[in-house]
Amino acid sequence: MATTPPHWTECRTELAARLGTVPRLLVATDFDGTLAPICPRPEDVQLPAAARKSLEALSNHPGVRVALLSGRELDNVRTLVHLPKLIYAGNHGLEIIGGGMDYVNPRSLDARPTLDDAARYLEEALAGIEGMLVEHKGLSLSLHYRLAPDNSAPRRDEAIASCATRFPGLKVHHGKMVAEFRPDVAWNKGFALKRLLKGLGLPAAAALYMGDDTTDEDAFAALNGLGTSLRVGPGAETGARYHLRDTDDTAEFLEWLKKLRVC
């Protein structure tokens, strides 16, 4: 893995050759931290107008499909973005709708009672700590602790470890100030991206994926070095080919891509 791949503006000619010549292109992207700045409270996040405008223009072009591959619940991210022609994949791809696809990972449905129990356990174990938020997303759980005091970390870590032990049917994944509990099934954003490509009849070379967190590395790897991958944010080891500084940079890249493909 490269520590920091080249910034996309250093590779415009290469990117134009990769993205401007394929007859049909899949533009797939994470949401929080990639398109929209992360907020302490997930419900406060909004899609910036510039990114929305570019995504809408790209999705209206017959040679482009746009997909959002988010850790959020599918209905939540679809409501936030509210662009009808997009493909939406929620819970890290455990559920997908759009582009002729209507998919829910069948094994993840069996985990719902366990997720209910795990959510109650975390809420009880962390009761009284201000800033701890347990978010039940139907097919997964997120424990957000961005707003919690630093001295709550030992109790938080103990609760996370204990929850993972008590509910072996769930697997814990750590992200940016969040611990996620997902059904322990062979599925991630990489598998979801491959399913999107198969459903659309596209090769990996016709795909672009952007993401900002460790969960996005599976999607980068799924492109097998053939597609175009961009990691958002500073200083992380990544398998992505290119680098975006932040969500503003993502908006600039999407504007450039819109001009390349649409205008």
State where each predicted segment sits.
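Substrate-recognition "cap/lid" segment bordering the active-site pocket of phosphatases
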Residues: 91, 97-116, 173-204
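Asp-based phosphoryl-transfer active-site loop
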Residues: 20-40, 68, 193
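Mg2+-dependent phosphoryl-transfer enzymes with acidic/Ser/Thr/Gly-rich catalytic loops
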Residues: 2-8, 22, 190-263
